[in-house]
């Protein structure tokens, strides 16, 4: 996080602190792999236990297959039971009926369930205009030890490149410092063979920054479309237009400049 701060200040770029949604954080740096101490205040340890304490029933190890529809009314959800690992479906079916159904399956899972259910779609918009804030990463080697796998990640940010770009102009982006567990670093670096091994040998000195690109506010940023495969699982078609590519290039350039301003000896996407 300090690399972002130092680089931003040297370039005259504004930055700020992120209010982290935690309680009793041990600063282990495993955030990207799932919090091992339940300090991260996710729905798993906040909303769901609260609901259970107030009479809710949690149906787990099932996959929602389709909504039970009566015209425009949703009567429940038909589900498929999963194996103990929650990976492979079994032959068992589970039907959940309710007075109210709230669909919260994310930007890809939600339209997929609506498509499988053949829900009313008079304007043929289900699954279209899917926006995901495309993300770019720049990894840099610093002369000092960073040990990015220790401590709290994503505690600083910069919205400079959001505030200096009009909403309907070039694609703006937010810059943060992601959690960098060694496994996450190893699968995200654009290298292989000896180059990959050399990079990982320098891991204690590696800083990473990520940019969250603001899509959906320009006529050339039309987003993607969620479709169904032959087996009913979702797939995403997200065309990378020249407009999006320009945002990708600008974000990588901005992060690289901040890293070099902070003393980096090498940076790579």
Show where each model-derived region lies.
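Non-transmembrane alpha-helical segments in soluble domains
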Residues: 5, 48, 52, 114, ...
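Residue-level marker for well-ordered alpha-helical positions
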Residues: 2, 45-46, 108, 124, ...
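Conserved redox-cofactor binding core of oxidoreductases
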Residues: 1-66, 74, 267-269
């Amino acid at each position: 996080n300090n690399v972002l701060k130092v680089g931003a200040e040297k370039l005259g770029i504004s930055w700020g602190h992120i209010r982290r949604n935690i309680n009793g954080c041990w600063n282990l740096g495993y955030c990207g792999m799932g919090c091992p101490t339940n300090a991260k205040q996710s729905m798993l340890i906040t909303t769901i236990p609260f609901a259970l304490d107030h009479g809710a029933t949690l149906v787990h190890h099932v996959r929602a297959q389709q909504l039970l529809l009566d015209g425009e009314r949703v009567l429940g959800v038909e589900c498929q039971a999963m194996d103990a690992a929650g990976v492979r479906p079994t032959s068992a079916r589970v039907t959940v009926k309710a007075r109210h159904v709230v669909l919260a399956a994310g930007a890809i899972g939600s339209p997929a369930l609506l498509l499988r259910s053949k829900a009313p779609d008079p304007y043929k918009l289900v699954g279209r205009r899917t926006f995901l804030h495309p993300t770019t990463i720049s990894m840099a080697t610093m002369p000092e030890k960073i040990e990015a796998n220790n401590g709290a990640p994503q505690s600083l940010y910069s919205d400079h490149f959001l505030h200096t770009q009009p909403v309907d102009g070039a694609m703006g982006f937010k810059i943060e410092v992601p959690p960098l567990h060694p496994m996450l670093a190893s699968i995200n670096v654009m290298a292989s063979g000896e180059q990959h091994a050399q990079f990982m040998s320098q891991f204690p000195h590696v800083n990473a920054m990520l940019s969250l690109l603001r899509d959906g506010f320009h006529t050339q940023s039309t987003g993607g479309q969620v479709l169904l495969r032959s087996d009913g699982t979702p797939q995403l078609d997200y065309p990378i237009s020249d407009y999006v590519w320009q945002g990708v290039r600008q974000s990588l350039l901005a992060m690289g400049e901040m890293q070099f301003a902070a003393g980096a000896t090498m940076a790579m996407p």
